[in-house]
Amino acid sequence: MALLASCRSKDPNTQVGACIVSPENIILSTGYNGFPVGCSDDEYPWEREGEHTKYPYVVHAELNAILNASGKSLRGARIYVDLFPCNECAKAIIQSGIREVIYLSDKYAETPATLASKRMLRSAGVTVRHLETCLSTLTLNYHKK
């Protein structure tokens, strides 16, 4: 589901999705990286470098999934994400009561933000697990009958 959610992102460089699941394996919420509601994708920059970048504006997938839960309790839940959460998302994960992070990629493993994230998650007792998969692509076939 996190991979499907990532397909909704309009970011030309990085599409990240998140899916929050209850201890009973019920999907509670999904999210993807993008601009806040009401901020047009056409009016804000998607650039990664230069004077005007996306970074001050983009809401990460994890935070969007937490906010999209709209008051549902996330205590004890798991969050599945394409990319290991940054330090800001780790704070939201911890504060929301999510107890496990399952991630697909850790491509920024040695950056200060990711190292801080790992430290906070570990200190807060949040379980972190890398999803091992042999799949390199996800293909959906839809046949209308």
Regions found by a protein language model. Give the residues of each.
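Zinc-dependent deaminase catalytic domain
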Residues: 1-145
